[in-house]
């Protein structure tokens, strides 16, 4: 891929290129220009002739009239057109000689494109992402939002494209699907350009990192961690070089000022003037990246009794999402709830904060505890006409506007933003408001349901560090692998039948544990036996 500005090569060799930058830096816009969805204001994009480009569609309703399998095969537009034209010819009642010639031509092209393997290849992608075989002939309109995301991702991956563009491919994917995608991309031989806020994902799949800052792209031959270390080292080296140059400039200026009027030293002064003119300080323009300051400080230390849950059960729409759940929390527990059963996790969190009643069982918070809750669906929180400042003030014991604005400032809301109406905030801004609310509460128990959704990488990093330092108890769920691994010291997984696995361990150790895999396998075997019966 080349840009017309100086015919600069953006991608010269196959590999996986991670495109990073602050929110608003232009990552998604750049991908849309590469894919032809947007026209550039200046210049153009040249792709090597004969190469096929595929990209992840963002419109989840575009294919509602088609089957799941057809939607995936549409990832190779020409192959799908051949299939449909071929089927239309064979369906004719009056099949002519011309139809026979055309059908023969199509069959030849179809065979060259491995058309006979198309359905099985599409099915393999769907199964890998967690779309079971019995859904492959369903209409897209009948699928859930998360299932549609997986189908559209399979569409982008279908047919071994030469260039693959993925904008936030891990959004709304469960962890098994993310792991499958990681392995797929690691083994993918062609070019991938991916935008993601998932640091673990970028580290695992990317061979190169392209950093967008102030409209310019800087390419690094390494993954996200390599970029982070290299870019910081480069800034450090530039600062040191500038310091030496500034010292040299001062030395030359002093000599010139002292001896420029001295006849015997005039030649030396002139020489130093030329030397001074040649010294150029490196441009140290600060990055457009901004990190919020996230610091949860409990008003009260937690006692020994934190939370006791006994025999908790809940059925929703005829499905038992929680089945006899029991556990006890200690005062230093940071619990990550993992697995594909997201409804069960959200239900448990809602019960624990009093928004929902269990069908059976009970729970009890310790007398020294206070809870702050981050809901997955925050619509109700912002369904009002309050300004940001007034919205946060209602949750603060101290009603002083300056005090409240201090918390907003830490979350990248400058003074003038305080008069914005919360109803019109972006997804990321609403998340930062909710985190401000949790900080100002002084709670010693934090319950967070998918807090990393809608956040940029800088905010995720800041939240990650804030939770690591937090001296209280945390219950949370997230699809960000590194976020879970670095925050949690205990893992709970609610299985599809509503029962739970509970293990004091890190996330990576949990995934690698044969014992945990065996428990899941026993559950799957029992489910299959029940289905057979």
Predicted feature locations:
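ABC ATP-binding cassette signature C-motif
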Residues: 1-242, 295-533
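Proline-centered turn/helix-capping motifs that create local helix->coil transitions or kinks
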Residues: 117, 264-268, 278-288, 364, ...
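Intracellular alpha-helical coupling/juxtamembrane segments of multi-pass membrane proteins
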Residues: 230-283
């Amino acid at each position: 891929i080349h840009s017309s500005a100086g015919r600069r090569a953006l991608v010269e060799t196959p590999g996986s290129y991670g495109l990073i930058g602050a929110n608003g830096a232009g990552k998604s816009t750049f991908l849309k220009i590469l894919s032809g969805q947007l026209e550039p204001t200046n210049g153009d994009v040249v792709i090597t002739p004969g190469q096929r480009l595929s990209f992840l569609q963002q419109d989840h309703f575009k294919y509602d009239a088609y089957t799941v399998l057809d939607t995936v095969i549409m990832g190779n537009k020409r192959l799908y057109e051949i299939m449909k034209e071929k089927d239309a010819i064979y369906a004719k009642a009056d099949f002519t000689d011309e139809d026979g010639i055309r059908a023969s031509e199509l069959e030849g092209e179809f065979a060259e494109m491995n058309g006979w393997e198309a359905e099985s290849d599409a099915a393999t992608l769907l199964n890998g992402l967690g779309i079971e075989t019995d859904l492959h002939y369903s209409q897209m309109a009948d699928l859930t939002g998360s299932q549609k995301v997986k189908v559209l991702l399979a569409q982008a991956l279908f047919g071994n494209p030469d260039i693959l563009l993925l904008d936030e491919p891990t959004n709304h994917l469960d962890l098994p699907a993310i792991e499958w995608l990681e392995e797929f991309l690691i083994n993918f031989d062609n070019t991938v350009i991916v935008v993601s806020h998932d640091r673990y994902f970028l580290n695992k799949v990317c061979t190169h990192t392209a950093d967008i800052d102030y409209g310019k792209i800087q390419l690094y031959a390494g993954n996200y961690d390599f970029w982070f270390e290299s870019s910081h080292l480069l800034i450090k080296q530039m600062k040191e070089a500038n310091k030496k140059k500034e010292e040299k400039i001062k030395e030359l200026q002093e000599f010139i000022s002292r001896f420029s009027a001295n006849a015997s030293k005039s030649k030396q002064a002139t020489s130093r003037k030329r030397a001074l003119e040649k010294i150029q300080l490196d441009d140290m323009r600060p990055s457009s990246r901004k990190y919020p300051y996230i610091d949860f400080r409990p008003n009260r230390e937690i006692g020994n009794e934190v939370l006791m849950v006994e025999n908790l059960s809940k059925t929703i729409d005829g499905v038992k999402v929680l089945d006899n759940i029991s556990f006890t929390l200690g005062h230093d527990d940071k619990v990550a709830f993992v697995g594909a059963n997201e409804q069960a996790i959200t239900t448990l969190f809602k019960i624990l904060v009093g928004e929902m009643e269990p069908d059976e069982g009970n729970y009890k918070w310790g007398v020294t505890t206070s809870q702050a809750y981050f809901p997955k669906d925050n619509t109700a929180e912002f369904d009002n006409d309050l300004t940001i400042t007034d919205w946060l003030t209602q949750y603060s014991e101290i009603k002083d506007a300056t005090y409240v604005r201090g918390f907003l400032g830490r979350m990248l809301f400058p003074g003038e933003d305080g008069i914005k109406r919360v109803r019109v905030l972006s997804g990321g801004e609403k998340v930062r408001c909710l985190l401000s609310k949790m900080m100002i509460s002084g709670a010693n128990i934090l319950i967070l349901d998918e807090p990393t959704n809608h956040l940029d990488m800088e905010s995720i990093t800041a939240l990650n560090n804030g939770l690591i330092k937090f001296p209280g108890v945390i219950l949370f769920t997230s699809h960000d692998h590194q976020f879970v691994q670095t925050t949690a010291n205990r893992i709970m997984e609610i299985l599809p039948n509503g029962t739970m696995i509970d293990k004091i361990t890190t996330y990576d150790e949990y995934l690698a544990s044969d014992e945990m895999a065996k428990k899941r396998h026993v559950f799957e075997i029992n489910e299959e036996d029940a289905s057979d019966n």
